Amino acid sequence: MVVIRMARGGSKKRPFYNLVATDSRNRRDGRFIERVGFYNPVASEGSESLRISLDRVQYWTNSGAQLSPAVERLVKDYSAKVSAAA
């Protein structure tokens, strides 16, 4: 089964997450099919902390992919932010 989840990167005490579409049997930071965005929880004020390709997330969910709970929350928040800005 394909899932969209966060793969951790960055260094110690400074996490950075890539939002990836991957097979559920792969390791958290292992092989993935496609990178659909990123999340930086410790971003400074001037830099971008979240970017998601909503059309690619929509494509994967239409193809049967499941969203992890954390990614589901981020997608919901990001789509609300994008629609408010438009």
UniProtKB/Swiss-Prot annotation:
InterPro entries: Ribosomal_bS16, Ribosomal_bS16_dom_sf
Disulfide bonds: none
Gene Ontology biological process terms from the UniProt entry: translation
Keywords associated with the record: Ribonucleoprotein, Ribosomal protein
Any Gene Ontology CC annotation: cytoplasm
Molecular function per GO: structural constituent of ribosome
Name of a matching Pfam family: Ribosomal_S16
UniProt keyword Ribonucleoprotein present: yes
PANTHER family: 30S RIBOSOMAL PROTEIN S16, SMALL RIBOSOMAL SUBUNIT PROTEIN BS16M
HAMAP family the UniProt entry points to: Ribosomal_bS16 (MF_00385)
Family: Belongs to the bacterial ribosomal protein bS16 family.
Protein name (database record): Small ribosomal subunit protein bS16
